[in-house]
Amino acid sequence: MSTNLLNITDLAIELPAGSDRQYAVREVNLKLAPKETLCVVGESGSGKSLTARAIMGLLPAPHVKVTEGCINFNGEDLTKVSYEHLRQIRGSEISMIFQEPMTALNPVMSIGNQIDEVFRFHIDMQGKERTQKAMKLLEDVHLPDPINIMNAYPHELSGGQRQRAMIAMALALQPQILIADEPTTALDVTTQAQILKLIRDLQVEKNTGVLFITHDFGVVAEIADRVAVMQDGCIVESGDVDQVLNNPTHPYTQALIAAVPRLQPRASRISSEKTVLTVKDVSKTFGGGRGLFGFGKSAREVKAVKNVTLSLHRGETLGIVGESGSGKSTLARCIIRLMDTDSGDIAINGENVNQLGRADMRPWRSKIQMVFQDPFASLNPRIRIGDIIAQGPVTQGVKKQEADQRARELLDVVGLDELAFDRFPHEFSGGQRQRIGIARSLALKPEILIADEPVSALDVSIQAQILELLEQIRGQMDLSMIFITHDLRVAAQVCDRLAVMRFGEVVETGVTSEIFADPQHDYTKELLAAVPGQGWSQGLTAN
């Protein structure tokens, strides 16, 4: 008799008619034992999340459905049990942590009521006992001040706190299997490290089998016992974590691992002594005013940027790293004059542009451009790609025909077909849209490029392509670049120098290789220590 908690055999999930392919998942075979962590890894569209949702019976029926295979749990095929029985299994026997807790948690119910609902649905328990158990769960996941958390609503918690609350709900009834679908993807590196440790500790304590879905090989190296690699709905390779990470046999696995940025910084380039950008004592504060028409309580004042001083030399890439809320993106928007500063100077080629009005600033716009984190949100969905790229030069007085020709040339530079010129943003993948965003930023022939988390939402292979493209463009066009990221692996491969930000302040600056080798500030040390899979980056896995 099998000792596995879960056995998936020849699973196939069919897509509705008219889709780009017939099957989302084909011939998938997986097994999960008690106390084991199985990581299912792959890029977007590989079928990872649909496989997990099939286990839970959460496929978007009737359009997407299991057509072949079985999902065996405790002797039952979950593809054949009734809906009512499956509801009993969810939460009590198999639980799931979703990628985005803000959309998975009920926004109009307090955290305490949502945990209480789990108990009320599955077991007969008095209200006082339910409250005590909910409090204990919040303590187990290391949430501060459980009483206030119980009464708080999801929007009142940070991302890490919301994820901890969801873990508490998932573990409320001590399930045999915990499915974690990209639970740390949207979290900062220190919060990610805490959540990974929490899941591991609770797993050992409660003998839980964990099915962990991710695209991050650093996370895989940190927590996995076994790994299954998915591509186009199929498992192309599986085995022990050491075997798959250190001796992959399938070309797709090899390509994915080769695309993962290493934590060892590359050698810094010798940049020009000429300073193209100087930021001196820049500050920016939000809030502090009253509500509509001056009534109501004063809004909380947030000092997003505090007395920041930086410089950027010609031809170099300066990385600005830090966690959410550190002020990185606010500083970038101040530098490019998308928002006004409270104080300080911003000089481009020695000219202070911080106090210039809109009309006086226009000639300087061509010298400094920005690549945004979410290209889909920053591209007008109603305008063709060629017009999006040509729009900047046209507003600067360039003739439309000349601007269109420049747009076609830039599409070639960023590796897109000339047919893209007449298409719309929704017709492209995420990586292609980011290439379009880069082309648009280059249309005005800038001297300085600010890239704000340009690869954070991309799969690892696409991420590697975009980073390579940015490096090629920087060299060909003699650009100076500010690269904003929270991913220290990316920073190690891209940046010549680093500025580390925390709570709006720059706490450490220096050459990238020197900061990685000998960080001086405690916060920098904390960030570096929290990067997952550091043992693997030296050729060994954590396990």
Labelled PLM ranges:
Residues 65, 78-95, 113, 121, ...:
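ABC ATPase NBD coupling module
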Residues 66-77, 344-352, 406:
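Conserved ABC transporter NBD signature motif
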Residues 77, 129-148, 352, 401-419, ...:
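Conserved ABC ATPase "signature" region
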Residues 172-176, 443-447, 463:
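A short, proline-enriched helix->beta-strand linker immediately N-terminal to the Walker B motif
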Residues 220-222, 491-493:
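A short, surface-exposed alpha-helical micro-motif characterized by mixed small hydrophobic
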Residues 235-239, 247, 506-510, 518:
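ABC ATPase "signature
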